[in-house]
Amino acid sequence: MAEPKRTQVVTTESMNRNFLDEYNSRDAILKYSTKTAGQGVNYLIRHDYASIYDQAVDLCRATSDRPLRVLEFGCGAGMNLIGLVSRLQQRGIPLERAWGTDFSASLIESASAEAQAFLPDASRKTVSFHVARNERLSADLSASTDRAPEELTGSFDFVFGVNTFRYCHRLHNAPDCAKDIYRLLRPGGVVVMIDMNDRFPLFRSRLKRSVEAPQEAYLPSLKEYAEPFESAGFEITARNHFCWIPHSAGHRLTAICRALTPILNATIRSRAMRSLVVARKPA
């Protein structure tokens, strides 16, 4: 009985090393930085994702009118958080702080540079980026910000993560991440999770499975994405599939995918590229 357990630990450590090597690389920085990322992700941040964030922020503000405190976990080079901060400014919604976390120090450094380059001075003062692992979000955030865990508990209004929660499932620590998010959110606070849909044909392809180890290629179902949040005590307010635009798409492919979206949504929405879970901590 002990032998399989030891093998699993080695596999998990190996996967952690692989992920860290990948997301500390120059390619990762280019992939997740505004100027060098695909047109697809830049479009989504300004439109599809922005609409989701708008609704989540409005849900937060229904129970509190204080200036927002926002956290993005697995923020990469900061594109989503910077986009959200710009969106809040456009909407005239006051922001007290917006923090981004990632386990890659290289991406955190890049995110800080992105904020300097793309945010005005007033907004930039509210934004900071910190090294923290998803599975130890509360503890690592406490250490990196030099704030006691008790000070962070219940201190955020809105938490979100894009294309990061699947790694928690692959490493079997999704419940730990969801519990930490629950702990960090105030009552009435909202979490948004966006990630890859296991039903999208390309993500299920034999070719993809043949070049990746089974555990590294694993994608959760929509039900599996939602379960850790439900178990942590959240109320699920939305769960669905959406988005037909690849993050890496250029201008032409983005335009084609946008044109096809209404037809695809009407016929095969469950096969869309992204899974969405929106959950609220009971007030």
Q: Can you name each region flagged by the protein language model?
A:
Residues A2-T63:
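Conserved class I S-adenosyl-L-methionine
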Residues M79-D140:
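Class I SAM-dependent methyltransferase SAM/SAH-binding core
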Residues F160:
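A conserved beta-strand element that flanks and buttresses the S-adenosyl-L-methionine
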Residues C168, K208-E224:
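Acceptor-substrate binding/catalytic loop of class I
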Residues P175-P187:
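A short glycine-rich, Lys/Arg-flanked "PGG" loop and its adjoining helix->strand segment in the class I
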